[in-house]
């Protein structure tokens, strides 16, 4: 055993002087943390669940990033509680697909990018890497805009300076990686808790109509017949699955030490990883519901503009719009939650970038360099817009709409292979998708891909 450890250490130390390293021939996804979290043997349910708790929160972050906020709040402001049913259905689809991604990683010992690359050419691997990297950068743009505006609102500094400050998260990430994977999970969980508590408090103050709120979780035909409502519903469903979250989920499910030759150990890992994923995605569902409920309780019927972060911030401090609960503290709490959302997504974006680079093009670079490169590529267009429009937040937020197009383009290249691989008896053995799971997943795939194509065409103006 000691000999194996020494060999691993010598391999880890060998490429220190190499900036780019080839990962061809390596099988482990995120090798530095793969199997690094020990799971107690023969422990009780709660102790075992605690050991598996963590990866799910990193996945859930993608479902409550700043890019989703405006759609949810605007949905409530325009159509009250009617679109809560769309959030519910979207969350159930997310739970299904993320559980499949985790199961794929646990059973095969490889992530989605690695398995896709094994079945495609080198050229196609590069193309898929570029498409998925573009999606990660698009998510990064949303984080930068959200974090930059939050910093400006909290500290009253120029937006350009706030955007530049967001690049400092490279240093934060380096520190977190040294602390260990469990510490990363705990810090992200803390940031998510801040978001959850802020919006729970603000919804409590807003005093929503509970009977109408719960009725909103039942779908109505208006969602399909009302064109404006349909467009917002498409926006919510279209953002259901972040493509890079599927790659991430298939990889970080392998951070727990599992004996893949032991059927019971694999089955246990699948069970508890799925529970963790569903619990954390339930939190994301609650946060997105709270955002829509807040929009409905405070802004429905007021004719207020709530399509921008700054509009929302100012409205929460305006008694003519939100009534007696308006206060500077309410606005500041919103900005704190916005900053927490942007920063919590930083870690998952970096890990996803490493996974797809190693999986698709068999290349590894230092995390700090990868994060810096991704962030600089994302910051550049935002900075150009910020300087050109003299720090006008409303103009800059238009980039959010454009960034969603990249996410929509990348989605089919992640979701179709995922369903195909997890439905393969050859790959998954006895853990292959059950019939109802397979058919449900294919229906969800067709719906999501179709909606994303529709959104792309609508965004670029091909259809009205």
Curated annotation (Swiss-Prot):
Induction: In response to bitter compounds derived from hops. Keywords: Cell membrane, Ion transport, Membrane, Symport, Transmembrane, Transmembrane helix, Transport. The chain crosses the membrane at residues 57-77, 82-102, 125-145, 157-177, 186-206, 229-249, 281-301, 321-341, 376-396, 399-419, 443-463. Pfam families: Nramp. It is a multi-pass membrane protein. One of its GO terms (biological process) is iron ion transmembrane transport. It is found in: Cell membrane. InterPro entries: NRAMP_fam. GO terms for cellular component: plasma membrane. PANTHER family: NATURAL RESISTANCE-ASSOCIATED MACROPHAGE PROTEIN 2, SOLUTE CARRIER PROTEIN FAMILY 11 MEMBER. H(+)-stimulated, divalent metal cation uptake system. This is Divalent metal cation transporter MntH. It comes from Levilactobacillus brevis (Lactobacillus brevis). The gene is mntH.
């Amino acid at each position: 055993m000691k000999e194996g450890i020494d060999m691993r250490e010598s391999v880890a130390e060998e490429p220190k002087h190499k900036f780019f390293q080839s990962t061809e021939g390596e099988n482990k996804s995120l090798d530095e943390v793969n199997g690094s979290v020990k799971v107690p043997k023969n422990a009780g349910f709660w102790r075992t669940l605690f050991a598996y708790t963590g990866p799910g929160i990193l996945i859930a972050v993608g479902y409550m990033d700043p890019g989703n906020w405006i759609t949810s709040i605007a949905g409530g402001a325009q159509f009250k509680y009617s679109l809560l049913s769309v959030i519910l259905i979207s969350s159930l689809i997310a739970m299904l697909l993320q559980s499949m991604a985790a199961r794929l990683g646990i059973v095969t010992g490889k992530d989605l990018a690695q398995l896709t690359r094994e079945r495609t050419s080198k050229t196609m691997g590069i193309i898929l890497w570029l498409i998925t990297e573009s999606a990660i950068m698009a998510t990064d743009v949303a984080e930068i805009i959200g974090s930059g505006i939050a910093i400006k609102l909290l500290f009253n500094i120029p937006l350009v300076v706030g955007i530049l400050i967001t690049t400092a998260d490279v240093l934060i990430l380096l520190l977190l990686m040294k602390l260990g994977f469990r510490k990363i999970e705990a810090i992200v969980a803390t940031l998510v808790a801040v978001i959850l508590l802020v919006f729970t408090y603000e919804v409590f103050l807003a005093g929503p109509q509970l009977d109408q709120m719960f009725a909103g979780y039942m779908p109505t035909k208006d969602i399909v017949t009302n064109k404006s409502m349909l467009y917002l519903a498409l926006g919510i469903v279209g953002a259901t699955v972040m493509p890079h979250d599927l790659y991430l989920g298939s990889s970080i499910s392998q951070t727990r030490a599992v004996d893949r030759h032991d059927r019971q150990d694999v089955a246990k890992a699948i069970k508890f990883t799925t529970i963790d994923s569903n619990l954390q995605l339930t939190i994301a569902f609650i946060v997105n519901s709270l955002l829509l409920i807040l929009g409905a309780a405070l802004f429905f019927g007021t004719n207020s503009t709530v399509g921008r972060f700054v509009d929302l911030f100012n409205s929460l401090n305006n008694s003519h719009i939100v009534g007696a609960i308006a206060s500077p503290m309410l606005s500041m709490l919103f900005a704190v939650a916005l900053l927490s959302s942007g920063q919590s997504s930083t870690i998952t974006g970096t890990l996803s970038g490493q996974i797809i680079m190693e999986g698709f093009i068999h290349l590894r670079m230092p995390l700090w360099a990868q994060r810096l490169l991704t962030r600089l590529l994302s910051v550049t267009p935002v900075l150009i817009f910020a300087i050109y429009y003299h720090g006008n937040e409303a103009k800059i937020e238009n980039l959010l709409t454009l960034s969603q197009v990249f996410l929509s383009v990348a989605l089919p290249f992640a979701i179709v292979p995922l369903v195909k691989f997890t439905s393969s008896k050859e790959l998954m053995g006895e853990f292959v998708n059950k019939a109802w799971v397979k058919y449900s997943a294919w229906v969800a795939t067709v719906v999501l891909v179709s909606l994303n194509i529709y959104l792309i065409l609508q965004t670029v103006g091909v259809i009205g």
